[in-house]
Swiss-Prot record:
<dbReference type="InterPro" id="IPR005855">
    <property type="entry name" value="GFAT"/>
</dbReference>
<feature type="active site" description="Nucleophile; for GATase activity">
    <location>
        <position position="2"/>
    </location>
</feature>
<protein>
    <recommendedName>
        <fullName>Glutamine--fructose-6-phosphate aminotransferase [isomerizing]</fullName>
        <ecNumber>2.6.1.16</ecNumber>
    </recommendedName>
</protein>
<dbReference type="GO" id="GO:0006047">
    <property type="term" value="P:UDP-N-acetylglucosamine metabolic process"/>
</dbReference>
<dbReference type="InterPro" id="IPR017932">
    <property type="entry name" value="GATase_2_dom"/>
</dbReference>
<dbReference type="InterPro" id="IPR029055">
    <property type="entry name" value="Ntn_hydrolases_N"/>
</dbReference>
<dbReference type="Pfam" id="PF01380">
    <property type="entry name" value="SIS"/>
</dbReference>
<keyword id="KW-0808">Transferase</keyword>
<dbReference type="InterPro" id="IPR046348">
    <property type="entry name" value="SIS_dom_sf"/>
</dbReference>
<feature type="active site" description="For Fru-6P isomerization activity">
    <location>
        <position position="599"/>
    </location>
</feature>
<feature type="domain" description="Glutamine amidotransferase type-2">
    <location>
        <begin position="2"/>
        <end position="218"/>
    </location>
</feature>
<feature type="domain" description="SIS 2">
    <location>
        <begin position="456"/>
        <end position="594"/>
    </location>
</feature>
<comment type="function">
    <text>Catalyzes the first step in hexosamine metabolism, converting fructose-6P into glucosamine-6P using glutamine as a nitrogen source.</text>
</comment>
<dbReference type="GO" id="GO:0004360">
    <property type="term" value="F:glutamine-fructose-6-phosphate transaminase (isomerizing) activity"/>
</dbReference>
<comment type="subunit">
    <text>Homodimer.</text>
</comment>
<dbReference type="GO" id="GO:0006002">
    <property type="term" value="P:fructose 6-phosphate metabolic process"/>
</dbReference>
<dbReference type="GO" id="GO:0005829">
    <property type="term" value="C:cytosol"/>
</dbReference>
Length: 604
């Protein structure tokens, strides 16, 4: 949610900021702005809407070598230019961009800023006014004013601050919100995400919570809030420019759907050797063996991926698995087993709700494993162990390849633990072979895109509501499929356990109500789900079937190649991703950037 970019040094700041903001569009936003300065002039430009709207307002005379930029997703105050970042202090001297939520902003406003005039309703404007007050009224230095403000502010934040009277420096601080420093020759940068600056540098430095950074063109100084200087090593980001471009695709989502066979094969090469033996960190295996219960904590699509792996993990590891919504567990952690282990699923590794749970787990001494797509992310740094899903950058807001990669990665983990326990079922599970078949199944489904588009046009062209139904793992896939459809097509859609239809949901079925039925796993499951299909069809529902090969009948709509039952959720979800994509496309919507949504939810 939101994005920050900043640069100081021998570069064209306007170009770098705008390119960086464009790379952060996937995070979600409703307004944007930049502040650019040099020794002779400063320019502050803000706009509601897309980055293209901001670019249209920037004149050729907006130039400078230092600047900060921001994409905003409204939390405090509506989406207006006054509420868009960057924000300025009372006199306009100080300029600030901010990601996060300042929890005590009203207290700060009444306690410290009586008589100040505010242009908008944001918590960020309160922060920059506070810094300005400490400098211009209380006569503190800029650095001391920033530190004092940080000692008062409560909540989550990533700040980038500039002084229009000394434009060769950017001041940075963070707490519970992601921020990176990009390193260059004769210039340095700050950004929320390495993708924003990968065109300019591949060298980055992590900063931790409650650390302050002073950026000049030739130096990066990191201190704690008491002023003690800290040493930070840099790392090279393993990103390729081709990975973050759309290429010939109209939307990132379609590109990322198409990349899933490659992701499956990448996971095979990462977690298996040439002979097919699974390779997972032995310390992770030992930790799971010592646990008496695994708790999977996640949000959104990652939560659904957890459900899709629950049965597999339990069967192969002989360890009970419990699922939890991270946003709920952060406030109320239920009674735990005697030897719990937490597994946190997060594409970005920055999900604020999951981090809140992790902080509690660490305080309780509970071992944790983060399964993520982003090395060096907050969750990966703060958890006991990390397992990467190697899906490559996922830019479309609606997650596709991260979901399937999480399931595949956890399959390697489950098999590794089962083998270590001597479980025969795990020893017999030829995961490399089976996952190769999954990749082929995905490719077969992707070759039928025209068929899916045709089915979607007939089923969902004008509807406002739809339902997915399934049993067992198909129910878990139905939950994810419904989320995907509602996210990007704005069709109200719910995924239900097929057996629950008679317990209330069937009252919503009327003439031409779209119902998409998922059928895999066994003849018994297929028989019962087909009974539910007859029930909704008798009430006028328009039914579309997605059926695993071998369970299909004449008249079924989409046939999916048969794969191992543990991996069936990967194969079965692919048609539903395409259904969501074409439903959005046919309605003329922005597939990659659905309204009101952010890719990485970095505030609670």
């Amino acid at each position: 949610m939101c994005g920050i970019v900043g640069v100081v040094g021998n570069r064209n700041a306007t170009d770098i900021l705008m390119q960086g903001l464009e790379k952060l569009e996937y995070r979600g936003y409703d307004s944007a702005g930049i502040f650019v300065a040099n020794a002779n002039q400063t320019n502050l430009i803000k706009s509601v809407g897309r980055i293209a709207d901001l670019r249209a307002k920037i004149g050729i005379d907006v130039a400078g070598s230092t600047g900060i930029g921001h994409t905003r997703w409204a939390t405090h105050g509506q989406s207006t230019e006054d509420n868009a970042h960057p924000h300025t202090s009372q006199t306009g001297r100080f300029v600030l961009v901010h990601n996060g939520v300042i929890e005590n902003y009203l207290h700060i406003k009444t306690e410290f800023l009586a008589g100040h005039d505010f242009k908008g309703q944001t918590d960020t404007e309160i922060a920059v006014h506070l810094i300005g007050k400490f400098v211009e009224e209380d006569k503190l230095s800029v650095l001391e004013a920033f530190k004092k403000a940080l000692s008062i502010i409560e909540g989550s934040y990533a700040f980038a601050l500039m002084d229009s009277q000394a434009t060769d420096t950017i001041y940075v601080a963070k707490n519970k919100s992601p921020l990176l420093i990009g390193l260059g020759e004769g210039y340095n940068m700050v950004c929320s995400d390495a993708m924003a600056m990968i065109r300019e540098t591949s060298e980055f430095m992590e900063i931790h919570d409650k650390e302050l950074v002073i950026l000049t063109k030739d130096k990066v100084t990191v201190t704690d809030y008491d002023g003690k200087e800290l040493i930070r090593d840099s790392y090279t980001a393993e990103l390729d420019l081709s990975d973050i471009g759309k290429g010939t695709y109209p939307f990132y989502m379609l590109k990322e759907i198409d990349e899933q066979p490659t992701v499956m094969r990448q996971l095979i090469s990462t977690y298996a050797d040439e002979t097919g033996n699974v390779q997972v960190d032995p310390a992770i295996i030992t930790s799971i063996q010592e646990a008496d219960r695994l708790y999977i904590l996640a949000a959104g699509t990652s939560y659904h991926a957890g459900f899709a792996t629950k049965n597999m993990l339990e069967q192969l590891t002989d360890t009970p698995v419990e699922l939890g919504v991270a946003s709920e567990w952060g406030y109320h952690m239920p009674l735990l087993s005697k030897k719990p282990m937490f597994i946190l699923l997060s594409q970005s590794g920055e999900t604020a709700d999951s981090r809140q749970v992790l902080v509690k787990a660490n305080a309780m001494g509970i071992p944790s494993l983060t399964v993520t797509n982003v090395p060096g992310s907050t969750l990966s740094r703060e958890s006991t162990y990390t397992m990467l899903i190697h899906a490559g950058p996922e830019i479309a807001v609606a997650s596709t390849k991260a979901y399937t990669a999480q399931i595949a990665a956890l399959a390697f983990l489950a098999k590794a633990v089962g083998e270590a326990n001597g479980k025969q079922e795990a020893l017999d599970f030829n995961l490399v072979h089976e996952l190769s078949l999954v990749a082929q199944s995905i490719e077969a489904t992707l070759s039928e895109k025209d068929l899916v588009a045709e089915k979607v046009q007939a089923l969902l062209a004008t509807t406002r509501n739809a339902f997915y139904i399934g049993r067992g793992n198909d129910y878990y896939v139905a939950m994810e499929a419904a989320l995907k459809l509602k996210e990007i097509s704005y069709i109200q859609c719910e995924g239900f356990a097929a057996g629950e239809l008679k317990h209330g949901t069937i009252s919503l079925i009327e003439e031409d109500t779209p119902v998409i039925a998922l059928i895999s796993s066994s003849q018994l499951v297929a028989s019962h789900t087909r009974g539910n299909i007859q029930e909704v069809a008798a009430r006028g529902a328009h039914v579309l079937t997605v059926v695993e090969e071998g369970l299909d009948r004449e008249g079924d709509d989409i046939i999916v190649n048969k794969v191992h039952p543990f991996l069936a959720p990967i194969a079965m979800v692919i048609p539903t991703q395409l259904i969501a994509y074409y439903a959005s496309l046919q309605r003329g919507l922005d597939v990659d950037k659905p309204r009101n949504l952010a890719k990485a939810v970095t505030v609670e």
